[in-house]
């Protein structure tokens, strides 16, 4: 029976299931696919949570943001909001910006979302603080509530009188006061300033009574505008000075009284009365007929006295010091302003007088009388110094052609302590070839064109000629006007200096023109002397050049440069000295010339002369002696220097070589220093075996000794070579002595003994070295 009942129950359940509608359910995966499809078709807008398990619509996100803002009392940070809602921060930033555009009651401040209710509650809290303290700073509020000062300032001003009961100082918007606080300080300020009787610094009042600075200035301005204080304020803020009216009236009365009695008043007097701007004060206090000077104000009476004195000066050729007419407080600057801007400007005779030293007034007639005192001196002096128009001191040449002067080497003199100057370059004056008489144009080089050029040069260089120095002019004036002040005479002398100079130059020019013929003969003599010197030096230079042909490579280059830097440079200096005298009209000593002065002189030469002289100058810095000789031939030619160069015959050449050898022998016999002794012996041996003169520096002696090896016996060469090595050791040890000691250990006496031994050997072998050179001489 029970089985049947069970069957019936199961049949009933089956029938009920068949009759019941089925409910279809989707899996989570199917849901995700459907939503993804809808998003792709733009049918729905949703955003994922950070864990990706939930979706939010934009509307739901906004509702949750507003709910969280409400829960956090109207202020929440966006980072904190992102953590609560569990949505990416970019979605929250985007939605908040959208909410800010549509809702003006929301603010985004420093990453915090704030609503208007929060600001209202904040204003109520600020009001409580204000009422408790009486004043409050907006910047302090910003630090307290972590909000920008500008944001707080704007919202506080909007709620002033509604939530906040106080006022903002217009001079200091960052501070808020209560009405009671302002009224209390206004009463104190009115009381303090009412008691002041003399000018007082407002900053000192602020410091003494601890008033708020901005509030005090605002209240003080209102009290003065409302006439509740009898006074005035000069300056602004920290430099403001309060002056009561009673003090101002006393000042004004004193100023007017002093001016009426003295017809002037000093600015310093007003400064001592605490008047900060005396000029503007006097413009308001005095009438318009006063004269404002540098240190004081003058009236019309003083001006009238000065004008009367000027009229007397015009009437009689005299002068006046107006400082004697002015009150003692007047300065020289005051006198200058009074004269230049008032007296002389309005005086009808102002063209007849001059103002000197800002205080002297002198008539032009008086100056003309002083000028005539020097007429008798001019012609006499011009006749004595007329040659100064042609020649300038040699010491001025360097200053004329170069900005700085330098020491000039003397290339023809043997310096025993400088190995760059060689005994081989020394010669006697008698060794120079004798000059021959000039022919053709060289005989008389002064032409009418030369005279015109000289006259033109004189016109251009008048500034080099002075009549008298200012102290000398003052002495003459003192003898004639002993009653005049020294300062006045100094100024008169300065006025006379230029007119006297111009007049004297005209007198000197006339004297010069009368003396042209004598000057021309002197120029011919200078040209002749230069020609003789150049011929002698050039002959020696060419003979030395032959000696260079026995060398090659670095030795040839070094010897060539040395010859260019010594004899060739000396020749160039003589040529440039001659050109300077001809074309620049100054007398220049060849020994005073250097590369700088020569380069400066080149710029002043005519173009054709400049080109040839530049080539000559450039050849000195080269290596080729023949290039120098070619450039020299162009400069010495008939178109420029007109120097005749004599050809050297064999007989004269042998005589010069013989004289040069005799000179070396004479020097060798007198020489006692080892290095110079070896130098002279080497030059003698070279000349003996090559029949050529050599002009060599000390650093080339080893190369010459190497060259002589083939001409000497082994014993002679060994002796000379060993002597050379001893000299090198001696020089090295001398250099070591000059180095600073690096240690404090006691010196070993071996070094000093070595030095003595080397010196002793050098002295002992010197006789042998000399004998080698002289024996070779005898064998010849």
From Swiss-Prot:
The record's InterPro entries line, in alphabetical order, gives: Ufl1, Ufl1-like_C, Ufl1_dom, Ufl1_N
Can you quote a single GO CC term? endoplasmic reticulum membrane
Q: Which Pfam families match?
A: E3_UFM1_ligase, UFL1, UFL1_C
UniProt entry tagged with the keyword Plastid = no
| Residues spanning the membrane | none
GO molecular function list: UFM1 ligase activity; UFM1 transferase activity
Q: Does the keyword Zinc apply?
A: no
Compositionally skewed regions (Basic and acidic residues) per UniProt: 443-458, 736-750
Top-level taxon in the UniProt lineage: Eukaryota
Q: State the residue spans of region: Disordered.
A: 403-458, 734-760
Question: What processes does the entry annotate via GO biological process terms?
Answer: protein ufmylation; response to endoplasmic reticulum stress; reticulophagy
Q: List keywords of the entry alphabetically.
A: Transferase, Ubl conjugation pathway
Judged by the first EC level, this protein's enzyme class is: transferase
Enumerate composition-biased segments (Polar residues): 403-413
Give the E.C. number(s): 2.3.2.-
Function field: E3 UFM1-protein ligase that mediates ufmylation of target proteins.
Q: Record's family?
A: Belongs to the UFL1 family.
- State the protein's name: E3 UFM1-protein ligase 1 homolog
């Amino acid at each position: 029976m029970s089985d049947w009942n069970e069957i019936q129950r199961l049949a009933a359940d089956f029938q009920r299931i068949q009759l019941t509608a089925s409910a279809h359910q989707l899996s989570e995966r199917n849901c995700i696919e459907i939503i993804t499809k809808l998003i792709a078709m733009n049918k729905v807008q949703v955003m994922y949570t950070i864990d990706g398990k939930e979706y939010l619509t934009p509307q739901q996100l906004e509702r949750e943001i507003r709910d969280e803002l409400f829960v956090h009392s109207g202020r929440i940070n966006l980072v904190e909001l992102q953590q609560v809602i569990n949505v990416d921060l970019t979605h929250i930033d985007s939605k908040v910006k959208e909410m800010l555009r549509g809702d003006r009651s929301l603010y985004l401040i420093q990453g915090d979302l704030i609503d208007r209710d929060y600001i209202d509650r904040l204003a109520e809290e600020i009001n409580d603080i204000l009422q408790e303290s009486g004043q409050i700073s907006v910047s302090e509020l910003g630090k307290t509530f972590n909000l920008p000062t500008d944001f707080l300032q704007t919202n506080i001003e909007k709620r002033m009188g509604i939530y906040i009961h106080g006022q903002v100082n217009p001079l200091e918007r960052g501070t808020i006061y209560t009405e009671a606080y302002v009224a209390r300080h206004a009463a104190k300020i009115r009381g303090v300033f009412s008691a002041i009787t003399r000018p007082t610094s407002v900053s000192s009042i602020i410091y003494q009574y601890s008033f708020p600075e901005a509030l005090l200035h605002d209240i003080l301005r209102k009290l003065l505008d409302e006439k509740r204080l009898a006074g005035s304020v000069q300056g602004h803020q920290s430099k403001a000075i309060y002056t009561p009216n009673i003090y101002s009236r006393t000042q004004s009365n004193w100023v007017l009284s002093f001016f009426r009695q003295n017809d002037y008043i000093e600015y310093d007097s007003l400064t001592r009365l605490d008047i900060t701007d005396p000029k503007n004060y006097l413009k308001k206090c005095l009438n318009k007929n006063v004269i404002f000077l540098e240190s004081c104000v003058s009236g019309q009476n003083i001006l009238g006295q000065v004008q009367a004195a000027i009229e007397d000066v015009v009437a009689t050729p005299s002068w006046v010091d107006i400082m004697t007419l002015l009150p003692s407080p007047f300065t020289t600057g005051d006198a200058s302003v009074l004269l230049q801007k008032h007296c002389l400007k309005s005086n009808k005779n102002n063209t007849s007088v001059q103002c000197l030293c800002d205080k002297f007034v002198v008539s032009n007639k008086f100056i003309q009388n002083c000028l005539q005192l020097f007429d008798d001196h001019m012609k006499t002096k011009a006749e004595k110094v007329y040659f100064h128009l042609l020649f300038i001191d040699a010491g001025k040449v360097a200053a004329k052609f170069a900005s700085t002067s330098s020491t000039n080497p003397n290339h023809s003199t043997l310096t025993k302590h400088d190995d760059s100057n060689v005994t081989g370059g020394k010669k006697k004056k008698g060794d120079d070839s004798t000059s021959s008489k000039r022919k053709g144009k060289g005989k008389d080089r002064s032409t009418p064109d030369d005279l015109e050029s000289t006259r033109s040069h004189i016109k251009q260089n008048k500034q080099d000629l002075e009549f008298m120095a200012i102290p000398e002019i003052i002495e003459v004036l003192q003898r004639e006007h002993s009653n005049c002040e020294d300062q006045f005479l100094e100024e008169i002398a300065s006025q006379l200096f230029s007119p006297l100079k111009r007049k004297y130059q005209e007198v000197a020019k006339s004297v010069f023109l009368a003396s042209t013929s004598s000057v021309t003969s002197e120029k011919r003599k200078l040209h002749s002397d230069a020609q003789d010197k150049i011929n002698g030096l050039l002959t020696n230079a060419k003979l030395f050049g032959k000696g260079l042909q026995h060398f090659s490579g670095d030795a040839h280059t070094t010897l060539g440069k040395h010859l260019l830097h010594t004899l060739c440079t000396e020749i160039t200096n003589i040529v440039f000295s001659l050109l300077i005298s001809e074309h620049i009209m100054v007398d220049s000593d060849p020994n005073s010339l250097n590369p700088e002065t020569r380069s400066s002189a080149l710029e002043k030469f005519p173009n054709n002369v400049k080109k040839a002289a530049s080539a000559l100058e450039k050849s000195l810095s080269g290596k080729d002696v023949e290039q120098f000789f070619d450039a020299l031939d162009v400069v010495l030619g008939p178109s420029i220097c007109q120097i005749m160069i004599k050809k050297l015959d064999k007989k004269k050449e042998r005589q010069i070589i013989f004289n040069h050898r005799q000179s070396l022998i004479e020097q060798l016999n007198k020489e006692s220093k080892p290095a110079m002794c070896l130098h002279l012996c080497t030059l003698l041996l070279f000349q003996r075996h090559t029949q050529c003169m050599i002009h060599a520096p000390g650093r080339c002696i080893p190369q010459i000794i190497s060259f002589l090896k083939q001409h000497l016996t082994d014993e002679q060469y060994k002796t000379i070579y060993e002597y050379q090595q001893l000299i090198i050791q001696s020089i090295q040890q001398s250099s070591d002595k000059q180095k600073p000691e690096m240690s404090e250990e006691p010196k070993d006496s071996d070094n000093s003994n070595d030095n003595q031994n080397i010196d002793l050997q050098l002295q002992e072998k010197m006789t042998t070295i000399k004998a080698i050179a002289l024996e070779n001489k005898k064998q010849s």
